[in-house]
């Protein structure tokens, strides 16, 4: 019985590992909407304060960054920590943090990282799942960078380290 249990667990582990590797190797389709249409996509978020927010509400900043995230994602937490730590270098960037989790979960995340005290950050729920559909998100955090004309610059499918982001927006 012990051998059967061990065999079962080994097969289960290998199957899970195989699936994860297969998912990782799925390339972004060249006809993905964000690669063929350079404009910021249409979306509607329910902000954590209960207000509605769409792409039309994005104020004029040198850059706009859309981050699709999950509050319990360790990489998303790291991204938030680093963003807040470097916010003085990112004052010319408007951040839209969008997730599909519940408002209380998103609000707790936002409060933990002090988003409410930052004038260039909003956080809300993508109730219609439009952002991950548009970008074909496979991992969180997914980061999309747009310039001051709201034109696509670059996407980071697994988040971006702040030095790399600063290099991009410093040269673009």
Which residue ranges define each predicted feature?
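N-terminal "domain-start" segment that seeds a small globular fold
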Residues: 23-56
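Short active-site neighborhood of thiol/selenol oxidoreductases, capturing the structured segment around
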Residues: 54-77, 83
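Short, small/polar residue-rich loop motifs at catalytic or cofactor-binding pockets
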Residues: 39, 62, 138-140
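Thiol-/selenol-based redox modules, centered on thioredoxin-like
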Residues: 89, 139, 145-172
């Amino acid at each position: 019985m012990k051998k059967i249990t061990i065999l079962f667990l080994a097969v289960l582990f290998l199957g899970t590992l195989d699936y994860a590797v297969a998912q990782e190797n799925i390339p972004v389709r060249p006809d993905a909407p964000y690669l063929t249409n350079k404009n910021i996509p249409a979306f509607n978020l329910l902000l954590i304060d209960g207000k509605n927010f769409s792409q039309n509400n994005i104020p004029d900043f040198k850059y706009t960054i859309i981050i699709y995230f999950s509050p319990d994602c360790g990489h998303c937490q790291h991204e938030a920590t680093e963003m807040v730590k470097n916010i003085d270098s990112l004052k010319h960037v408007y951040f839209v943090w969008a997730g599909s989790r519940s408002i209380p979960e998103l609000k707790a995340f936002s409060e933990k990282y002090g988003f409410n005290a930052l004038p260039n950050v909003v956080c809300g729920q993508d109730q219609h799942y439009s952002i991950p559909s548009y970008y074909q998100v496979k991992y969180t955090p997914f980061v999309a960078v747009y310039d001051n004309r709201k034109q696509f610059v670059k996407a980071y499918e697994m988040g971006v380290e702040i030095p790399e982001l600063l290099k991009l927006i410093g040269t673009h």
